[in-house]
């Protein structure tokens, strides 16, 4: 999958979340986000109604991380190992650079919003790339084809959302990355044996 050039919207999102982590959400101003992202006020408001709208943008930051990982994935890795690697890298980034209160806010807002639910948007890079990996696993016979790629993608995404929710619920009292490193292999065992 080719690496995409970082869009203006993605640059704003990444800058905002870096500032939220460093300074806290409440202490970060729109002006600081504009300066850090090297954009104009008009450009910022073209993409976002205000700072609050950025809470729903965390999934874009996740996609940015995945796009950074594209060139690092060895095509010779098994599909299982690709999924383990991607999950480890994403959760490590979340654990060490995302304010857990903001993650909790994102999850709660996704349950009540009437707007687009970014965490379940199938057009996201995340869903497309993980589905491609799962399809390759099904085609090669690495994953048993008793379920479709879409069904396995739903299970994988549900696993990640559940673990992130639990980690936020318990206020990060355990290592998200280490816990997932122990649990995800069991989920992928099901992919190999059949669901």
Feature names for model-found ranges:
Residues 48, 55-62:
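Alpha-helical DNA-contacting segments of helix-turn-helix folds
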Residues 57, 71-97, 149-156, 177:
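Hydrophobic alpha-helical connector segments
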Residues 1-23, 27-39, 53:
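Basic, helix-initiating cap at the start of DNA-binding domains
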Residues 38-48:
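Short hydrophobic/aromatic patch on the recognition helix
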Residues 118-123, 139-155, 178:
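All-alpha amphipathic helical-bundle segments outside canonical DNA-binding/catalytic cores
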Residues 85, 89-92, 128, 132-140, ...:
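C-terminal peripheral helix-coil segments that are non-catalytic and often amphipathic
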Residues 91-131, 142:
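Short secondary-structure transition hinges
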């Amino acid at each position: 999958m080719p690496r995409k050039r970082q869009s203006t919207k993605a640059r704003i999102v990444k800058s905002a979340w870096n500032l939220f982590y460093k300074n806290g959400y409440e202490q970060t101003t729109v002006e600081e986000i504009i300066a850090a992202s090297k954009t104009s006020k008009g450009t910022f408001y073209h993409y976002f109604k205000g700072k609050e709208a950025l809470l729903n943008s965390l999934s874009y930051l996740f996609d940015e991380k995945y796009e950074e990982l594209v060139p690092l994935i060895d095509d010779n890795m098994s599909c299982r190992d690709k999924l383990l690697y991607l999950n480890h890298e994403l959760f490590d980034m979340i654990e060490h650079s995302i304010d857990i209160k903001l993650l909790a806010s994102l999850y709660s807002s996704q349950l009540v919003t009437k707007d687009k639910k970014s965490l379940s948007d199938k057009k996201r890079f995340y869903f497309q790339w993980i589905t491609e990996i799962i399809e390759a696993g099904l085609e090669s016979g690495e994953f048993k084809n008793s379920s479709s790629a879409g069904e396995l993608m739903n299970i994988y995404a549900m696993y990640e959302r559940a673990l992130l929710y639990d980690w936020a619920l318990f206020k990060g009292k355990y290592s998200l990355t280490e816990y997932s490193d122990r649990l995800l292999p069991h989920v992928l065992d099901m992919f190999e044996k059949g669901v």
